[in-house]
């Protein structure tokens, strides 16, 4: 009973859009990216919104992404997710997210992960 109450409180504290975003993130991005420690495959996306592009010291970024520079804003993340190769030619990122609602859900979720 106590565990169920704790679970209900946790679910109530999580906005529905964040839960949806987390599910979309896990489906579209979670195969390579985490919101915890960096994997060998891809950099962590914890705190990505507002972070300088290609700035984590524990990940070896592609020359294309390093050359892009800038900051990961909501608009930049949307453009990158739409077509990574067009946004940063030479990037190793190969997965795009063509659906605008999915991209928005992912970005909204990433804004909550600090």
Task: Indicate residue ranges for each PLM-predicted region.
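C-terminal capping alpha-helices of c-type cytochrome domains
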Residues: 73-114
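N-terminal signal peptide c-region/cleavage motif recognized by signal peptidases
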Residues: 11-16
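Sequence/structural segment immediately N-terminal to covalent heme-attachment motifs in c-type
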Residues: 18-40, 45
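Sec-exported extracytoplasmic/periplasmic mature domains
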Residues: 26, 30, 34, 50, ...
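Short Fe-S-cluster ligation motifs
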Residues: 57-78
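Positively charged n-region of N-terminal signal peptides that target proteins for export
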Residues: 1-4
